[in-house]
From Swiss-Prot:
Catalyses which reaction(s): 5-(methylsulfanyl)-D-ribulose 1-phosphate = 5-methylsulfanyl-2,3-dioxopentyl phosphate + H2O
Cofactor binding, note field: Binds 1 zinc ion per subunit.
Species annotation: Leishmania major
Gene Ontology BP terms: L-methionine salvage from methylthioadenosine
GO molecular function annotations of the record: methylthioribulose 1-phosphate dehydratase activity; zinc ion binding
Binding site for Zn(2+): H118, H120, H197
Name of the protein in its database record: Probable methylthioribulose-1-phosphate dehydratase
Amino acid sequence: MDTLTHLSHTLREAMSDIVPESHPEHPFNLIPELCRKFYDLGWATGTGGGISIKMGENYYIAPSGVQKERIKPNEIFVLNASQDVVEEPRTEKQLKISECTPLFFNAYRMRGAGACLHTHSANCVLISLLCDREFRISHIEMIKGIINNETKKALGFRDTLVIPIIENTDFERDLTASMAECMERYPESCAVLVRRHGMYVWSDTWQKAKGAVECIDYLMGLAIRMRTLGLEWEPKDVK
């Protein structure tokens, strides 16, 4: 393959994930849609939660302190890899960039993520109160929907899902260092729980991140019900 052909092929690969702003899967449109879905699930009520998606060399992030179910495409911030805002929201509203931004970039820098999602799910908060340093569960079918961050392969039915827990802080940005340290200690995990607060989940693509957060929240809700019934989260006698 000559140099020109190689460069052309490389450019096509780099552009393959970039779609026009009118496309429903462009982050300007996708982030508001996902925020509405998360709001309906109770994961982003009261202006809580956050969503960030990478496309090309840009990072798209929802604003902070707004009604997440009412975010519009022209209200999204665009950042570069240095966390500099390269495009302000195209609105007259005085919007503030998400407090989650440095935590999103933990996932981008340390995991090469394509998306990072932050929820304030009640299931996450309850699990963080029931567990000490980790949430662990095995032998549940929905575990198969979660990717091992190191091997990039899906977990199996008999595998144990392990999600670490860090302590909450008064300000979101102050979680940055403890989240990064936790990610170093748990290289296989695609999520971090914040006690009495919520959860961060990331993956290579927004589709995988969305699937992971849905599976994890399901498993946490199930675990809470299992606890009330006296059922073990890591049973030893399952065939």
